[in-house]
Regions:
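Extracellular/virion structural assembly segments
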Residues: 1-146
Length: 146
């Protein structure tokens, strides 16, 4: 059952647009964000380099999430596709939550979309390239909201 699996901007993606996670998408989301580079300095008078290792911070990350889209017929598919583009992609911000991690909200910026693969009128597979600007901001309410 694919409804209740994925929420985008607070909406059940399957019930709203017929979209559900591809088999690789969850592991992509769960991949830890990289750290920012540590502050370091190479002194000419010392061997190696000095690295300040305390207080590591997360860096932004770019991810490519694979999705599947399905509908009962080609007209519904085209309608759902147009609505998804208008309601989500055109606004540029996606807040993604899954039933597998119910207390984690991924706040991402839409960058681009791949061409549909396996397009068969009522179903398709596509990938969204997203930027997660602050991987530490994954609570129910954004820490940047006033």
């Amino acid at each position: 059952m694919t409804n209740g699996q994925l929420y985008i901007n607070g909406k059940d993606a399957y019930l709203t647009w017929g979209i559900f996670l591809d088999e690789t998408a969850l592991s992509t989301l769960m991949t830890p964000a990289p750290n920012k580079e540590f502050i370091s300095n190479k002194y000419r008078s010392k061997d190696g380099k000095s690295v300040i290792k305390h207080n590591p911070r997360l860096d932004e990350r770019e991810i490519t999430l694979a999705f599947n889209m399905t509908a009962k017929d080609s007209d519904t598919f085209m309608t759902n596709y147009a609505r998804f583009c208008e309601e989500v992609l055109a606004k540029g911000e996606l807040v993604i939550r899954t039933r597998f991690q119910p207390n984690v909200w991924y706040r991402c910026i839409y960058l681009s979309c791949t061409q549909f693969s396996q397009f068969v009128r009522e179903m398709a597979k596509f990938s969204l390239k997203l930027n997660e600007p602050d991987p530490s901001d994954r609570g129910e309410t954004s820490k940047y909201t006033s």
